[in-house]
Design a protein with these regions (language model features):
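Outer membrane beta-barrel
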Residues: 29-194, 201-203, 210-218, 278-281, ...
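Hydrophobic alpha-helical segments, especially transmembrane helices
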Residues: 8-11, 140, 289, 293
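Short, contiguous, pocket-lining structural segments
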Residues: 167, 197-204, 230-237
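Cleavable N-terminal export/targeting peptides
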Residues: 1-30
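Short hydrophobic/aromatic segments of transmembrane alpha-helices and their interfaces
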Residues: 9-10, 74, 166-167, 271, ...
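Outer-membrane beta-barrel pore domains
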Residues: 2-4, 64-67, 109-117, 213-367
Length: 367
């Protein structure tokens, strides 16, 4: 097995090699090696995307994760990933994002209300693979949820209430063991929900199982249990996601979450749970539609700040004029049994309401 460090490409050597190529050889039609080819030959894969949007809300999109303004054009995310992941031995992944979404991720990682830092190392970890065992050390995205941070992994523009109430990243250790070709188990230990570092010893355990018996059905279940470093008390969270591919064009997804934060000197704690269901239909090579319906019960107001029951319905139309670009048009309606949405903010007061509406358009380019 070749050691990973022997795969490095030295810039000086590339420049020297380029200078040594006679101009006549290029003129004669000799093939030119591209950077992408050099990376591929060295075992490094690269991928990326740019997502930008315009959206308008009747209020300020309270309890949404990334689309939090009233009326705006914005760069959602520009992402780039480099990965060296051989089937055995050492490897590494670096995944960086920039844009408005990165500010939200940075704020979550610093346990602050907001951040002006529009750049984030979303994932950065080393890994070691031996047989059915993969060990990762560093920062990685969560196992929880049907939706992900990268817009390329979602069928809707906006994220669900469930996504808002889930962790996004973890920093620590994760081990995945493939029991069979269709069953894997995951265990890990990390700093907790989104924390890149903590000043003392509180840690969170990560547990998961993934079942993929055939191309029609898959099921994942994951749990996070540990003392939260900021809320200073135990937090328990369980999530499961089931996917059913009825045909090559029609799929259904159901996601259920349950969580509890114990009370402490700094928080009253609370329980929450919710369920989201998705239906996705690709009716041609260029057109698709995605529907999402959701119910979220924040009994004690720990997640949203208001004890309330939330519901939402979302429809997203996707159009792919070419294979690496998608245009999305979305409509969403949120309701609550309490006035928990911010409708307007003035110098004198904040106006609350029990519903909010959003329309959005997003373009996603992948490379």
């Amino acid at each position: 097995m070749q050691k990973p460090f022997t795969q490095r490409i030295h810039l000086t050597a590339l420049i020297a090699a380029a200078g040594a190529v006679p101009a006549g050889a290029l003129a004669a039609g000799s093939p030119v090696t591209t950077l992408s080819q050099l990376l591929t030959d060295s075992g490094i894969t690269e991928s990326g995307y740019v997502a930008a949007s315009y959206y308008h809300s009747s209020g300020y999109n309270t309890d949404h994760q990334f689309d939090t303004s009233h009326d705006t054009f914005q760069l959602d995310q520009a992402g780039l990933q480099l990965a060296f992941q051989p089937k055995s031995g050492f490897g590494a992944v670096v995944d960086v994002i920039a844009g408005e979404d990165a500010k939200i991720v940075n704020a979550a990682e610093s346990a602050s209300a907001s951040s002006s830092n529009a750049f984030d190392i979303l994932q950065g970890y080393a890994q070691y693979v031996t047989g059915p065992l993969t060990i990762q050390a560093g920062k990685f995205t969560t196992l929880a949820g049907a939706e992900v941070i990268a817009p390329t992994g979602n069928t809707n523009f906006s994220r669900s209430f469930l996504f808002y109430a889930e962790p996004m990243t973890h920093t620590g250790l994760r081990a995945t063991y493939a029991l069979t070709d269709t069953v894997s188990v995951i265990v890990g230990i990390n700093n907790g929900w989104n924390y890149t570092k903590v000043d003392y010893g509180s840690k969170t355990g990560e547990f998961g199982i993934a079942l993929n018996p055939d191309k029609y059905f898959s099921l994942t279940a994951q749990a996070y249990i540990g003392k939260d470093p900021v809320d200073l008390a135990s937090r328990t969270f369980f999530d499961t996601v089931a996917t059913f591919n009825a045909t090559s064009a029609l799929s259904f997804v159901v996601s259920y979450d349950w969580g509890r934060q114990d009370a402490s000197a700094v928080t009253a704690g609370g329980d929450w749970d919710g369920i989201a269901a998705y239906a996705n239909y690709q009716w041609s090579s260029q057109w698709r539609v995605s529907l999402r319906g959701e119910y979220f019960d924040d009994r004690n107001g720990f997640i949203t700040g208001t004890a309330q029951k939330l519901k939402e319905g979302t429809i997203t139309l996707g159009y792919d004029p070419v294979s690496d670009f998608e245009l999305r048009l979305e409509g969403r309606y949120d309701t609550s049994n309490a006035p928990g949405f911010v409708k307007a903010v003035t110098a004198a007061s904040t106006v609350l309401t029990d519903n909010q509406t959003e329309i959005a358009m997003q373009g996603v380019f992948k490379f």
